[in-house]
Structures are given as structure tokens and as C-alpha cells.
């Protein structure tokens, strides 16, 4: 490993530890179980899963560090000049599915890639972001989530949050449904527009912001009463989450195509989901308002 890779790895391992500790404290019941694994083709990771807690129904915070002789198609499709290069990929990825339908599902990811070829300069880039998927929308939560995202981006330029917010809205979109997965946040990839130290500082700012963005929302909503019908709606909307992850998500596709660990890759899927044929929310209901108002490409900080 290069000194750069070592620095990124040390940060990611520490980030995983800190996020797991914060989530365990907030849940107040369940604890993460660690499953360390080795990838036969090169590398390995620490999968940490939590479930059946007081707040968290299922969640995972995964660290992986894998390498190989050639980039898989999902990583080189939009940069064909990198095809055939050896690669190293490090990242922390997490998904939290709460019991309570009033607590949104959250996802975050920070990652680092190096693609190398003998006789040529190494190409590196960062990617990541975080996004929120509510089932029963709340403006206060949406504004808070995006405010934390904006504050994390602010030291790196006034244009950074708007660009990566818009990218998130485009990326987490279910084309076959014609709707976004959630209310967005930040998404970016192929980040090397600044020098390495600045890009690495940005990644740290995003990774460190996740807990500040998510836990206040959990604290506000975790004790909200809910009905069996609201729970059913949560499970129905979780189906959209599954559809996106299995059809569009680049991280899922990269992991499967690179021979990654299937259990860790599919950790992001919720434990209970339902699909109903041509199901429609009642007009004027909270369920209808989710798609009509909250699941829109909205400027939450400018309204």
C-alpha cells in the first residue's frame, strides 16, 4: 500500500468504529456483530451488522479493501481508458433500516479507488455521499438533513453542495417508476478535481457529517406511535429501495462483478418488504403526500 492508501484506510476503519458506536448508543439495545472476511482474489473487510434492536430493525456498516488485476465493467464503463488496469478499492458503506415508519432509512458511503498500470501514472479518485429515504415525510427532517450536507460542503466552495445535491437527485432515481428513491442529499464520484489532500479532507468532512445529519432525526421520530397500516406502507415503500439497489446501484454492481462478498453487498436490503399489484395511496393521505410533495427534486434550503 502507498502512504495515501494507508491514510485513507486508517480513516475509514476509524469512521466505521465511530459510526457503529454512535448507532449502538442511540439504539440502546442491540449491538453490532462483526464478521471479518478475506477475499480470495485479494483483500477483505469487516462487515458489521445490527438487528432487532429498540430502534434499528436491520442495519450494516461495512468496511472493505479489495484489489485485483483489472477493473470490473461497472467501474470502467464511463472511463474506458481505465479498462485493464489493476485496481485497489477501499470504502465504508452503511444502510440503516429502522422499525418505526416515521424514522427514515439512511444510506452513506465514502470510497477511494486507485487504478494502476505498469509504466503509467496511477489514477485515483474518491466517491461517496449520503441520502435519506423517508416513508412519512417531515419538512423539519428534510431541511436538517440538507443543512448538514451544505455545511459539510461549504469549506470546499459555494458550488459544491448544489452540484452534488443535484447529482444525488439524478443518481437515486428509479427510471422505471419515474420517481426518486428518497429526498436525496449528496452524491459524487470520480472526485479528483482538487489535489489529493483537499479531496481526502472533503471525504472526511462528508463521512464525519453523517451521524450529525441522521441521529437528530432518529431522536425526534423514534417514539412516534404508528399503526399496522403505516407499517405496511413502510414495507411497500421499501420495495423501491430493493428495486434501486438491485437494478441501478453502482456499488452493488461493482461488488458483484468484482467477486465481492455477496452477504456484505446485499446487507443493504431491508428485512421485510412487500409488493402490491398497482397499489395506490388514498387521495389526500399522508401516503399520497410522500410522492406528491416529498419525493420531488426540491430545493429544501431555498424554499
From Swiss-Prot:
Residues that coordinate or bind substrate: 93, 109-111, 259-261
UniProt-listed Enzyme Commission number(s): 1.3.3.3
Subcellular location: Cytoplasm
Residues the record marks as active site: 107
Pfam families the UniProt entry points to: Coprogen_oxidas
Keyword Cytoplasm on entry: yes
Record GO biological process: protoporphyrinogen IX biosynthetic process
Organism: Pseudomonas putida (strain GB-1)
InterPro entries assigned: Coprogen_oxidase_aer (IPR001260), Coprogen_oxidase_aer_sf (IPR036406), Coprogen_oxidase_CS (IPR018375)
Subunit-structure text: Homodimer.
Keywords: Cytoplasm, Heme biosynthesis, Metal-binding, Oxidoreductase, Porphyrin biosynthesis
One CC-aspect GO term: cytoplasm
Reactions the enzyme catalyzes: coproporphyrinogen III + O2 + 2 H(+) = protoporphyrinogen IX + 2 CO2 + 2 H2O
Taxonomic superkingdom: Bacteria
PANTHER family with a match to the protein in the record: COPROPORPHYRINOGEN III OXIDASE, MITOCHONDRIAL, OXYGEN-DEPENDENT COPROPORPHYRINOGEN-III OXIDASE, MITOCHONDRIAL
Gene of this entry: hemF
Sequence similarity: Belongs to the aerobic coproporphyrinogen-III oxidase family.
Example GO molecular function: metal ion binding
Catalytic EC class: oxidoreductase
Pathways involved: Porphyrin-containing compound metabolism; protoporphyrin-IX biosynthesis; protoporphyrinogen-IX from coproporphyrinogen-III (O2 route): step 1/1
Cofactor(s), names only, from the UniProt record: a divalent metal cation
Role of this protein: Involved in the heme biosynthesis. Catalyzes the aerobic oxidative decarboxylation of propionate groups of rings A and B of coproporphyrinogen-III to yield the vinyl groups in protoporphyrinogen-IX.
Sequence intervals crossing the membrane: none
Binding site residues for a divalent metal cation: 97, 107, 146, 176
Site (Important for dimerization): 176
Region listing for Important for dimerization, in residue ranges: 241-276
Protein name from the UniProt record: Oxygen-dependent coproporphyrinogen-III oxidase
